[in-house]
């Protein structure tokens, strides 16, 4: 894994392939290693860049910053690698920063692919999310036992409507790494309590946007998807059968198909009809 210093932060990244640039932005609590189920297949078509955001995994020693720091980091990394404009794929919290990147630095983004972006998630909590918080004593554990609080969040976010969750099935190394940076996860979650980016910022985005939605995901993520697409008339939602919030891990082959279709490298699938008022 290579390194690049941007905005005073030493970021670790991995690069594969030689096609059009594709930047992968991981979610809150995740890290670049979780893209491994799709990296090789994506590299057949794209120049893929996957990095650990500041505060996570191998970039954990980077100075902490606010939420906007992640968009600035991504823009600077693309510039340093000569990879702009790129298709930017943001998963969960990474989708929030992908939106921010497209709003703040539109010239760096050719298109957005958002895998259940967790934008304004706290403005539409669901019974599942509230039950997770109550059952785990989430708010009490945040300070007393960060790893336990992060575990509860990971299990809820990766949960299937049919029962069980994807987090518990991940390789042990991945789970251990995600729990190791629990404090960074909880700090970022706390920062995301306020709606971010603003509605005006999201509305300013003009590039093509595809939102990927798992048909087994918690309704909170479905609501977030609808919120984002309600602000972006050019956006469309594509459903991924058999997947919950860890979409590219649950259904890696189909996930790659959706990404390649979204960027014009394959026939486009049928979009899910809009569920929000016009």
Model-predicted regions and their roles:
Residues 176-230, 236-239:
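Conserved serine/cysteine hydrolase catalytic core
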Residues 240-252, 256:
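Catalytic histidine-centered segment of alpha/beta-hydrolase-like enzymes
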């Amino acid at each position: 894994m290579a390194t690049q210093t941007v905005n005073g932060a030493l970021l670790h990244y991995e690069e594969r392939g030689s096609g059009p640039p594709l930047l992968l932005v991981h979610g809150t609590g995740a890290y670049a290693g979780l893209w491994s189920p799709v990296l090789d297949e994506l590299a057949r078509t794209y120049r893929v860049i996957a990095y650990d955001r500041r505060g996570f995994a191998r970039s954990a020693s980077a100075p902490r910053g606010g939420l906007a720091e992640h968009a600035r980091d991504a823009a600077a990394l693309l510039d340093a690698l000569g990879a702009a404009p790129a298709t930017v794929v943001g998963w969960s919290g990474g989708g929030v920063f992908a939106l921010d990147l497209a709003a703040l630095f539109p010239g760096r983004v050719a298109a957005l692919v958002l895998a259940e972006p967790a934008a304004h998630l706290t403005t539409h909590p669901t019974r599942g999310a509230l039950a997770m918080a109550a059952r785990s004593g989430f708010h009490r554990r945040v300070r007393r036992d960060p790893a336990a609080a992060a575990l509860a969040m990971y299990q809820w976010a990766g949960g299937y409507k049919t029962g069980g969750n994807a987090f518990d099935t991940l390789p042990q190394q991945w789970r251990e790494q995600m729990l190791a940076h629990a404090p960074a996860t909880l700090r970022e979650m706390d920062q995301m309590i306020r709606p971010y980016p603003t509605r005006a910022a999201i509305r300013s985005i003009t590039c093509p946007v595809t939102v990927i939605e798992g048909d087994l995901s918690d309704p909170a993520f479905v609501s977030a998807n609808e919120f984002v697409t309600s602000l972006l008339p050019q956006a469309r939602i594509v459903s991924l059968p058999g997947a919950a919030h860890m979409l590219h891990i649950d259904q890696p082959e189909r996930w790659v198909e959706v990404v390649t279709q979204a960027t014009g490298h394959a026939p486009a699938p049928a979009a899910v009809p809009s569920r929000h008022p016009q």
